[in-house]
């Protein structure tokens, strides 16, 4: 009996000694994962979206900016991490036939102004000075948090700008301009002050590529709607309001983004191809040499989406629900599967359905026969009133 006890004890000790390295290995792997997570260079995303144009005929520039705003919000970036600057309030413009709305598509179903737009800088507050102060953090202490870019050295920042520009400059409010040198220096200040990890700069304007020619700071990727010497063209004219609804480049970028979901593996190389010259008429450009990573390894959601926080733990968590609840949920799920087919992520969003639906039919116009009959009636009344002698005054 004693021998049997010593034999069992020996086997138990031997098994413990054999399993000890495996337990240590698992614990070390978890520690390595935790250390890698906390040392990650990317923990949060920010967006600075700027429309620099005023006046009703620049309606499309406001629609451009609001469309990008809705896309980044849909992919998870909250308003607290978005700085929205609109140089004019098209939603409340007296010429707007549908007040409190801004549309980006002909079918007039997608109101990009929406009910939850938070404009941080509006009207004449949108200036070159305020824009540069937001980027560099040189703002008065009384400035509210919603108007601050509170990024750090782990922040990926999307900066989108649209308006009227030329070779090496972008106009603000038709009264001042920012040059490519000023913009490059602002980005360098951001890098020196550790205000970003990686930066994506997108500009939709004439000769947009000239705005990123002077960049010299690291970890910047830039895209433009047109090359130097080219115009960036508008898209979707709407006779009802007398202006174009969007610019071509931003229109196709928006269509591309509507197919992206938070778990998408689409990379930046795909974004470079969204608007070829056959669609944009202008030649879009991009610059990646200051960027350290290969664009094909950079996900779209690294800039347009939220960063999902992951908590690593060694504790055991039970994932088994209550048996009664599980049974009822399975029965309900079975009924739902019979009633509906599975949908893709983009198909579940009302925005995507609106964008890809066919435009509404044009307004009713009288048929040609009706017009001819009306003219015949007018001529008969004329003859009856004045006679054939006045015919020479018509022809």
UniProtKB/Swiss-Prot annotation:
<feature type="binding site">
    <location>
        <position position="206"/>
    </location>
    <ligand>
        <name>a protein</name>
    </ligand>
</feature>
<dbReference type="GO" id="GO:0042765">
    <property type="term" value="C:GPI-anchor transamidase complex"/>
</dbReference>
<feature type="active site" description="Nucleophile; acyl-thioester intermediate">
    <location>
        <position position="206"/>
    </location>
</feature>
<feature type="active site" description="Proton donor">
    <location>
        <position position="164"/>
    </location>
</feature>
<feature type="transmembrane region" description="Helical">
    <location>
        <begin position="369"/>
        <end position="385"/>
    </location>
</feature>
<feature type="region of interest" description="Autoinhibitory loop">
    <location>
        <begin position="231"/>
        <end position="236"/>
    </location>
</feature>
<dbReference type="GO" id="GO:0006506">
    <property type="term" value="P:GPI anchor biosynthetic process"/>
</dbReference>
<comment type="subunit">
    <text>Heteropentamer. Part of the GPI-anchor transamidase complex, consisting of PIGK, PIGT, PIGS, PIGU and GAA1. Interacts with GPAA1. Interacts with PIGT; this interaction, via a disulfide link, stabilizes the expression of GAA1 and PIGK and links them to PIGS.</text>
</comment>
<keyword id="KW-0732">Signal</keyword>
<feature type="topological domain" description="Cytoplasmic">
    <location>
        <begin position="386"/>
        <end position="395"/>
    </location>
</feature>
<keyword id="KW-0337">GPI-anchor biosynthesis</keyword>
<feature type="binding site">
    <location>
        <position position="232"/>
    </location>
    <ligand>
        <name>a protein</name>
    </ligand>
</feature>
<feature type="topological domain" description="Lumenal">
    <location>
        <begin position="28"/>
        <end position="368"/>
    </location>
</feature>
<dbReference type="Pfam" id="PF01650">
    <property type="entry name" value="Peptidase_C13"/>
</dbReference>
<feature type="disulfide bond">
    <location>
        <begin position="275"/>
        <end position="280"/>
    </location>
</feature>
<feature type="binding site">
    <location>
        <position position="234"/>
    </location>
    <ligand>
        <name>a protein</name>
    </ligand>
</feature>
<keyword id="KW-0812">Transmembrane</keyword>
<keyword id="KW-1015">Disulfide bond</keyword>
<keyword id="KW-0256">Endoplasmic reticulum</keyword>
<feature type="binding site">
    <location>
        <position position="82"/>
    </location>
    <ligand>
        <name>Ca(2+)</name>
    </ligand>
</feature>
<feature type="binding site">
    <location>
        <position position="79"/>
    </location>
    <ligand>
        <name>Ca(2+)</name>
    </ligand>
</feature>
<feature type="signal peptide">
    <location>
        <begin position="1"/>
        <end position="27"/>
    </location>
</feature>
<dbReference type="GO" id="GO:0003923">
    <property type="term" value="F:GPI-anchor transamidase activity"/>
</dbReference>
<feature type="binding site">
    <location>
        <position position="118"/>
    </location>
    <ligand>
        <name>Ca(2+)</name>
    </ligand>
</feature>
<dbReference type="GO" id="GO:0006508">
    <property type="term" value="P:proteolysis"/>
</dbReference>
<dbReference type="GO" id="GO:0016255">
    <property type="term" value="P:attachment of GPI anchor to protein"/>
</dbReference>
<comment type="pathway">
    <text>Glycolipid biosynthesis; glycosylphosphatidylinositol-anchor biosynthesis.</text>
</comment>
<keyword id="KW-0472">Membrane</keyword>
<comment type="similarity">
    <text>Belongs to the peptidase C13 family.</text>
</comment>
<dbReference type="InterPro" id="IPR001096">
    <property type="entry name" value="Peptidase_C13"/>
</dbReference>
<feature type="binding site">
    <location>
        <position position="120"/>
    </location>
    <ligand>
        <name>Ca(2+)</name>
    </ligand>
</feature>
<keyword id="KW-1133">Transmembrane helix</keyword>
<keyword id="KW-0106">Calcium</keyword>
<comment type="function">
    <text>Catalytic subunit of the glycosylphosphatidylinositol-anchor (GPI-anchor) transamidase (GPI-T) complex that catalyzes the formation of the linkage between a proprotein and a GPI-anchor and participates in GPI anchored protein biosynthesis. Recognizes diverse proproteins at a C-terminal signal peptide (CSP) region that lacks consensus sequence and replaces it with a GPI-anchor via a transamidation reaction. Transamidation catalysis reaction follows a two-phase mechanism.</text>
</comment>
<dbReference type="InterPro" id="IPR028361">
    <property type="entry name" value="GPI_transamidase"/>
</dbReference>
<keyword id="KW-0808">Transferase</keyword>
<keyword id="KW-0479">Metal-binding</keyword>
<protein>
    <recommendedName>
        <fullName>GPI-anchor transamidase</fullName>
        <ecNumber>2.6.1.-</ecNumber>
    </recommendedName>
</protein>
């Amino acid at each position: 009996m004693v021998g049997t006890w010593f034999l069992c004890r020996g086997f138990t000790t031997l098994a413990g000694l054999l399993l000890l390295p495996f337990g240590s290995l698992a614990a070390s792997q978890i520690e390595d994962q935790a250390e890698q997570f906390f040392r990650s260079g990317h923990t949060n995303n920010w967006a600075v979206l700027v429309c620099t144009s005023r006046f009703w005929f620049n309606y499309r520039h406001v629609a451009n900016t609001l469309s990008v705003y809705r896309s980044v919000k849909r992919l998870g970036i909250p308003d607290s991490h978005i700085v929205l600057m609109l140089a004019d309030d098209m939603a409340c413009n007296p010429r707007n036939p549908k007040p409190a709305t801004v549309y980006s598509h002909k079918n007039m179903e997608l109101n990009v102004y929406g009910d939850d737009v938070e404009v941080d800088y509006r009207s004449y507050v949108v200036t070159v000075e305020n824009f540069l102060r937001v980027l560099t953090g040189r703002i008065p202490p009384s400035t509210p948090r919603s108007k601050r870019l509170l990024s750090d050295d782990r922040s990926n920042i999307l900066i989108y700008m649209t308006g009227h520009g030329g070779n090496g400059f972008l106009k603000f409010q038709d009264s001042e301009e920012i040059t490519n040198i000023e913009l490059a220096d602002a980005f360098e200040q951001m890098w020196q002050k550790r205000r970003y990890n990686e930066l994506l700069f997108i500009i939709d304007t004439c000769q947009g590529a000239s705005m990123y020619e002077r960049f010299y700071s690291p970890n910047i990727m830039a895209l433009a709607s047109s090359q130097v010497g080219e115009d960036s063209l508008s898209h979707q004219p709407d006779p009802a309001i007398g202006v174009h609804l969007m610019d071509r480049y931003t229109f196709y970028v928006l269509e591309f983004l509507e197919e992206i979901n938070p778990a998408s593996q689409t990379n930046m190389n795909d974004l470079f191809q969204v608007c070829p010259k056959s669609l944009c008429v202008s030649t879009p450009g991009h610059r990646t040499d200051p960027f350290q990573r290969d664009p094909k390894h950079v996900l779209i959601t690294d800039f347009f989406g939220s960063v999902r926080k992951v908590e690593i733990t060694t504790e055991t968590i039970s994932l088994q629900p209550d048996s009664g609840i599980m049974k009822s949920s399975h029965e309900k799920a079975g009924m739902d599967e019979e009633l509906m087919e599975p949908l893709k992520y983009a198909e579940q969003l009302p925005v995507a359905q609106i964008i890809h639906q066919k435009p509404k039919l044009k307004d009713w116009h009288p048929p040609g026969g009706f017009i001819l009959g009306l003219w015949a009636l007018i001529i008969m009344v004329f003859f009856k009133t004045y006679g054939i002698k006045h015919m020479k005054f018509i022809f």
